[in-house]
Amino acid sequence: IFGGSLGAKKINEAVFKSIDKLKDFNIIHIVGKNNSKSIEKPNYFQIEFAKNIWDYFNLADLVVSRAGANSIFEIQALKKPMLLIPLGKTQSRGDQIENAEAFKRYGFASVLYEEELTPVTLFKSITNLNKNKERYIKRMEEVSSVPSNKLVLQKILDLSK
């Protein structure tokens, strides 16, 4: 679970409050600099920053992330089912919402909008993603790099308008 290089307060708080419910998952939580909280659970590992995020992505069965283009394409390349929590329009240009919705349309990810993020919705979303992870993996395996390139090209064209 990570909210970008600086972390994400709302994601972190939802994770902290849902740790007990997420007991069936082993969680690596990248909280961002100065966002650590003392939580001692056998299934929970917390770090402030990951120098090589790919190592953590490779370890993961599922990824919970913001919806920045670089990150989600890296996660897709590794064929990891993902729950995307895009920055809202009040915090960004809205590009993360567009990215998340495109990945949802293509069957690569599920989406939980930040405005709907609570410990309960986070738990339900992670549980549903886990139940359906094979479907997401299969969909990512079906898609060659050509459609991914088309997604990137379409994004560039959309941004240039």
What are these regions (language model features)?
Residues 74, 86-113:
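Glycine-rich phosphate/nucleotide-binding loop
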Residues 134-146:
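A short, well-ordered alpha-helix in the C-terminal region of glycosyltransferases
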Residues 128, 145-161:
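C-terminal alpha-helical cap of glycosyltransferases
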Residues 5-7, 87-91, 142:
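Short histidine/acidic/glycine/proline-rich micro-motifs that form metal-
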Residues 53-93:
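A donor-sugar binding/catalytic signature common to diverse glycosyltransferases
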Residues 1-65, 97-101, 112-120:
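Donor-nucleotide binding loops and adjacent catalytic segments primarily
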Residues 1-2, 81-86, 110:
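Short beta-strands and strand-loop turn motifs
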